[in-house]
Amino acid sequence: MSYIAFDKEKLVNINFAKEREILRCSRSGAFATTTLCGLNTRKYHGLFIVPQDNFNGERHLLVSGLNENIVVNDMDFHLSIHQYKGGAIDPKGNKYLQNFSADSVPVYDYRVGKFNFQKSMLFQHDADRLIIKYTFLDKVDEIALQVEPLLAFRNIHQLTHANSDVHTGFETVDNGVGFCMYNGYTPVYFQFSAPVDYEHHPDWYYNIEYEEELKRGYDGHEDLWRPGTLTAKVKGKELYLTIGTEPMDAAEIAKLYTSEAKKRTPRYNFASCLKNAAEQFIVKRNDRTDIIAGYPWFGRWGRDTFIALPGLTLAIGKISLFEEIADSMIADLKDGLFPNIGAGDNASYNSVDAPLWFIRSLQIYFDHVNKPRKLWTKYGDVIKQILCAYRDGTMNNIRMLENGLIYAGGPGLALTWMDAIVNGRPVTPRTGCQVEINALWYNAIKFALDLARSSRDKEFLTDWEPITVNFPAVFKDTFWSKEMGYLADYVDGDYKNFQVRPNMLIAASLPFSPISERLKQLVLKRVTEELLVDKGVRSLSPKDPEYKGHYMGTQAERDAAYHQGTVWPWLLFPLTDCMLHVYPDSAPDVLNRILYRFDGCMTYYGLSTVAEITDGDPPYKPNGCISQAWSVAALLYMKWKIEQVKK
């Protein structure tokens, strides 16, 4: 029995199947995603989604799907499934499904009449190319496969509607055809491993409906371009179809599939699923190596990159990959800040914590490699640039106060990870001195001082040691309340916000924490009593009148709940460090129990991966991105740290 598997009863149940989503990716940044039964319920669902260099590297959905028709002894069996305006579903190709498994690649077992066949797919590891394999298990006199491409050629965040600008032509290639709907795009080539007949009948396919978009208050209807039909007659047991941005030798398609299948990480248990999921976030393109923050809609985020970096690389033994990603991000450093989203001219530097998480990730890297001089030589100038920018002042009113604390933000700005904005106003306003930012700041300076001391950088020591001397006392005086028994979330002048949030957990988790051992215990106690649940850590205590236990409704309603009680698995990263430090003897077993609560998540929502968030209230339904980098990274980090302690 496969670890990830579903039988016919589950596959023909559309309500069951559409709550489970499949994701497959290439390291070049291309990916495919849909529901278990193949019904696209989001505008982000598609068969071939590819970064477009002519559009700032943004991901564009080129191929929404295929209308597939198996012709067996002159009988038609339509395998596709679509939902149309008003909710009508036709055809219902999922009725032919018998089994699904995903050991190394996703495999669907079909039965049409008395004829059985399999369909599997994978991406070429390092290219924008998808390969679909059809394996025919029974001998039949005559079989043909008819495929109609359904094209969109649009940004993943937008929708296509019928228009007269589309290019109606096609290009003939080896055993296939190519299409390009608009100028500036890479063409898409459909090629079979066998000879193909192509009938060109260009037209629009109207009113496809995406119900998840309607739930979020967005336009949920799309028209897709259907240029024609490719027909391949089956001779032998196997037939391959490749979809790529460049044509290839059709005779090599089968060999390429076989070669790529051998490279896949099998999904035979929970741990292997996490490792496989980690690999899907890594994109190597145009001389960069980046982390995709979450599928299907997030791109590269600075904050997410550095929080996820140790778990996605060091925790699974990929030290050189850590360096590749860090070096790629450093290229975009500006005024001591990393882009929160975007790159180049489209970069947005609205993150106060990304640079501090960068230094924290270097600290974990240092703990792993223990080469202080090498680290200071390679990254010392970058660390200095960041620290000096914060001390002297940089964008978005990020600056050091006279007492050494960092102040950040202003009207309309949301610079921490609690960054949701609705109607121009932050849902979680935190302008001022934020508790985790100042703890990360202190930790960054102390770590840098250790590195500088090993390299005898006397000038740096002279400049920065004085800042740390009184910092713990200032921090405690600013954030601690003996009456409350925990740390304030942020302070702005005389105002102190004492909502119970997980940011104080970050402050208590750091190697150079500005608080005492006793205060760490009290912070951890508060977090475990009010915030820790089965699938992560709540963003706000349910005792708070602003708490929202469910993430649902329109996008504005969801954003209003995003950091107001919603559970975040990534916070298990600082929880791991804090628990192992405060309770080193009992923590490993406690953390191990938390870790394996996610085992059941591998067969729900995003298959074989971990979601971005869950509801704050039971049963903690997963939501947001189906696969989130820092969620997966937190679990891999937790697993890694538990194993280190138990050695």
Locate predicted features:
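Residue-level signal for inorganic ion chemistry
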Residues: Y134, A308, A507
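Aromatic-rich carbohydrate-recognition surfaces in CAZymes
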Residues: K139, T160-N163, T172, M181, ...
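Terminal accessory carbohydrate-recognition/targeting modules of carbohydrate-active enzymes
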Residues: M1-P266, F270, P296, R303, ...
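Extended glycan-interaction surfaces of carbohydrate-active proteins
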Residues: P195-Y198, W204-E212, G217, L224, ...
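Short, well-ordered beta-strand elements
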Residues: L239-G244, Y442-I445, T576
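Aromatic- and glycine-enriched pocket-lining scaffold segments that form the walls
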Residues: A389, C433-K458, D463-V469
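Solenoid-repeat scaffolds in large eukaryotic assemblies
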Residues: F322, L461, T468, K520, ...
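Inter-helical turn/loop segments and adjacent helix faces that build the functional surface
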Residues: Y365-K378, F447-W464, P514, R518, ...
